[in-house]
Every structure is written in structure tokens, then in C-alpha cells.
Amino acid sequence: MDTIRAIIFDLDGVICFTDNYHYQAWKELADAEGIYFDEKINGRLRGVSRMESLDIILERASRCYTQEEKEQLATRKNESYVRLLEKMSPRDLSDEVKNTLDTLRQRGYKLAIGSSSKNTKKILKQIGLDGYFDAVSDGTNITKSKPDPEVFIKAAEMVEEKPENCLVVEDALAGIDAAYAGGFISACLLYTSDAADD
């Protein structure tokens, strides 16, 4: 087995939980548009881009939306989401996660973020991890979302490691598929709904 030298973490659902903020922002948008949206539908949005998420929500719409309208809807959702992120603080970073990160760093691993979110840097700042990671690859520097491996490949390049020397830690199937497609070692965190709420 190849030596693991770097660990690439997804952000949402691994380092911290922002699912509820996403849900609130999507729900607000769907309600305003008269589109049915619930937590089950929200579950389908895990690990996919904002525009792909919007397409899933619009499957239940009573009318078709132009590309321009879709972009406006996605912007509205993100504005709501960013507003909700203001509520985040270092308290949203669990002691277990922070201790794990510190231990991995002390053991000499390079640490990176590989997230499709375009709000990654804001979230890291809100939870007190701004500047903590050796590299941050996110939705602002990729053109393809998971399950394409681009976000992880860029993170590996940023820490100057080959994919086979990087462990990807994910919580979504799209992320695990992306890690596999890129030739990375992967670990999937699974949570029950009760565990995610704790």
C-alpha cells in the first residue's frame, strides 16, 4: 500500500455541518417559487453543485425556467445561505474534529480541503480555521463538480502529492465516486440523522 502523506477533507458534513443552512436557504427559495421541497429532496442535493441542486428542485416546478432565471434563483439561494452562515462561529467546529486535525498535523500529514462549495473560505473563517489548511481547493477554482475528481486533483497538486499518496475523507457518495475516479484512497464518514444533530 502506498504511503499516505496528505489528507484531503470535504468541508460540509466532515469538518462542520452546514446542511441545515443549505436546507433553510433552498426551502426559502422553493417556497417563494411555489415549489414543493422537503428534507428528503434536500438529501438528494448532498455533494452536488448549486446549479445541479437547483435542477433537482426545479423537477417539481410547474413551469420551465430559462438559464438566466436559473442563475438568478441560484444567486438568491446563495445570498440567503451566506446570510445564514453569519450565524456560524468556532463553536460549530467540534472538539473532536479540531483535536483530530491537530493530531494529524503533529504527525506530519499535509492537510487540505476539497469542497465543491464556493463559500468554503467564508465557512473556514467563520469556524476559526482560516489559514489552517495547507491547501484549499473549492468551487472557486474548479470547473467540474463532484463526482468529477477535479477538486481533489487540484488539492493534491497544491500540496504537491500524487493522488495515491492522499486520503480523501468524504461524507457523500458523489465525493467517494470522485476520489475513486481520481485514484485516491478514500474514507467515508456515515452519520445517522441523530448523530449529525449532536
Where would I find each of the regions flagged by the language model?
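Short, acidic loop-to-helix structural element flanking the phosphoryl-transfer center
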Residues: 83-113
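Active-site neighborhood of HAD-like aspartate-dependent phosphohydrolases
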Residues: 1-43
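Anion (oxyanion) recognition and catalysis
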Residues: 31, 105, 180
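Helix-loop "lid/cap" segments that line or gate small-molecule binding pockets
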Residues: 29, 51-65, 123, 155-156
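Metal-dependent phosphoesterase signature
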Residues: 36, 59-95
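Substrate-recognition "cap/lid" segment bordering the active-site pocket of phosphatases
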Residues: 90-91, 118-167, 173-184
